A protein has these predicted regions:
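Structural motif
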Residues: 61-62, 76
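Short, positionally conserved secondary-structure boundary motifs
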Residues: 1-54, 85-86, 93, 97, ...
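Hydrophobic beta-strand signal
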Residues: 65-66, 79
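Short beta-strand-centered aromatic/proline hotspots
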Residues: 76-78, 88-93
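Short, hydrophobic/aromatic-rich segments at coil-to-beta transitions
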Residues: 41-43, 73-78, 99
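Catalytic Cys-His active-site segments of thiol-dependent hydrolases/isopeptidases
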Residues: 99-105
């Protein structure tokens, strides 16, 4: 599937409450690829599987955009390789501990121990969350 990269951006605040009829629209050009992928050589896309990050707005089947050039900070959402297995979690950096936190109460905090092999693969920058039930071109589900 080919997506048009240049599209029109209608600049206006969108009220979630009562709309203001006096608000005017401005039209600008927006290159979606430049917005979401400022560093193409270090940007990767992942299809999310599972529900451990729903509290962060990341749902099963979403498209996660990840930049490998960014430095992970405390509370960054990261792609991590933990003992060779890939996962998406929130990075928790404390004075003497490193942990990977899920954003769902059914998933425990993973405290990193010296016996664990942790590699921070990249930092999540955007999530594309479909608002319709139509199949997405990146979906892993049939």
């Amino acid at each position: 599937m080919t997506w048009p990269l240049d599209t029109r951006l209608l600049v206006r605040r969108i009220d979630a409450g009562f709309p203001s009829p006096a608000e005017e629209w401005r039209e600008l050009e927006l290159n979606v690829h430049e917005l979401l992928v400022p560093r193409p050589a270090s940007t990767f896309f992942f299809c999310v599987s599972g529900s451990s990050m729903v509290g962060a707005g990341i749902h099963d089947g979403d498209l996660l955009i990840v930049d490998r050039m960014l430095t992970a900070q405390h509370n960054s959402i990261i792609i991590a390789l933990l003992d060779g297995k890939a996962t998406v979690k929130r990075l928790q950096l404390r004075a003497r501990t490193i942990a990977l936190k899920a954003e769902h109460p059914d998933y425990p905090l993973i405290k990193i121990t010296p016996r664990m092999a942790l590699q921070i693969w990249g930092v999540a920058t955007y999530v594309v969350h479909p608002l319709t039930s139509a199949p997405q071109p990146w979906s892993l589900h049939p």
